[in-house]
Structures are given as C-alpha cells and as structure tokens.
C-alpha cells in the first residue's frame, strides 16, 4: 500500500500557476514533452487544470517545447 501523494501547490498556498515560471512547469512535463498526469504527480484537480493551461500558454509563446524533437 503506497502513501497518497500531496499536491505541492496546495501545501505552498499558490493562488494561481504562472505560465512564465518555466522551471516549475518543466517538473510537470516528461522527457517527450507531454504533460504528466495528476495520478503520477499527486496534483489536485484544480491545480492540474491550471497547470495544463499554463503549460499550453508557455508552449504557444515558445517558452516550452511541444515535443522532444525541438531539443535537437
């Protein structure tokens, strides 16, 4: 039996996830560029939605890559 993961954003008391904070967003993207699901990270549903929106905004503004091919 594994322990339930805790949402980092809830513990830190974050109101809204900033799309310009690329270092924090990179922790929620796997090596192929996909958004890591909340069952893996332990993020709550509220913050997972905000996280997905922030990552998509950062991708649109070319702050984050869409896929792993952009690293070459």
From Swiss-Prot:
Pfam families registered for this protein in UniProt: Ribosomal_S18
Superkingdom of the organism of origin: Bacteria
Role according to the record: Binds as a heterodimer with protein bS6 to the central domain of the 16S rRNA, where it helps stabilize the platform of the 30S subunit.
Gene Ontology terms: cellular component: cytosolic small ribosomal subunit
Keywords: Ribonucleoprotein, Ribosomal protein, RNA-binding, rRNA-binding
Organism: Francisella tularensis subsp. holarctica (strain OSU18)
Protein name: Small ribosomal subunit protein bS18
PROSITE patterns xrefs: RIBOSOMAL_S18
GO MF assignments: small ribosomal subunit rRNA binding; structural constituent of ribosome
Record's keyword annotation contains Ribonucleoprotein: yes
InterPro entries (UniProt xref): Ribosomal_bS18 (IPR001648), Ribosomal_bS18_CS (IPR018275), Ribosomal_bS18_sf (IPR036870)
Keyword Metal-binding belongs to the record: no
Subunit and interaction comment: Part of the 30S ribosomal subunit. Forms a tight heterodimer with protein bS6.
Any one GO biological process: translation
Annotated family: Belongs to the bacterial ribosomal protein bS18 family.
């Amino acid at each position: 039996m594994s322990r339930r993961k805790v949402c980092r954003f809830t513990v830190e008391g974050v109101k809204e996830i900033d799309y310009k904070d690329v270092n924090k967003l990179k922790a929620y993207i796997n090596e192929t560029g996909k958004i890591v699901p909340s069952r893996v990270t332990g993020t709550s549903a509220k913050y997972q939605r905000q996280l997905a929106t922030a990552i998509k905004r950062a991708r649109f503004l070319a702050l984050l890559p869409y896929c792993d091919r952009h690293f070459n």
